[in-house]
Amino acid sequence: ESSGYSWSQNSIRDYHSPINNYVGKSMITISNCVNDLEKRGFKKKNIFILGFSQGAIFSLWFIIKQKYSLGGCISIAGGFDKKVEFISENLSLESKQTPILLMHGEKDKIIPPKESKNTYDIFLNLGFNVELFLYSTGHKIPLKAKKIIWNFLINQTNNLT
């Protein structure tokens, strides 16, 4: 696997550093998207966020910081390298109703799968509805992931009625 490309060299790991403006701008962009969807008539419980790699980490960070819950968050090949204390210190309790699907390749050499496993344990201990699926690929999304994502979306939307 190659190291790939990031649209920003600043990651969520840099959140508390002087270069955190990229992370902050990303959070504002996601928030603006949610607000725009609401203005168009979507309810928050019908809005889902999906992120891959760096986007997965940003989507998880966005979820825990919100004063509301969304329909769900799908994080593919990205997770926190943080300890539970860091997450709980930054957690908004209102966000805990957002279901989370974590997916990660067990052969990922770019973002270690242990980060998704760590994220799963943290979110589970904090009371989130969280699922973790590991698959035998590297830093990519296998075709079989489509069915898992589809089932997650269907299950969450069925829970809304």
Task: Give names to the regions the model predicted.
Residues 50-55, 59:
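Gly/Ala-rich beta-loop-alpha elbow adjacent to hydrolase catalytic centers
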Residues 1-46:
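Serine-hydrolase catalytic machinery in alpha/beta-hydrolase-like enzymes
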Residues 49-51, 76, 103:
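Short beta-strand immediately N-terminal to the catalytic nucleophile in serine-hydrolase-like folds
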Residues 68-81:
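A conserved short beta-strand
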Residues 101, 114-161:
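C-terminal catalytic histidine-bearing segment of alpha/beta-hydrolase fold enzymes
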Residues 4-13, 79-99:
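Flexible "cap/lid" loop of the alpha/beta hydrolase fold
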Residues 101-104, 108:
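Short beta-strand/loop motif that positions the catalytic acidic residue
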Residues 61-65:
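Active-site signature of alpha/beta-hydrolase-fold catalytic machinery across serine-
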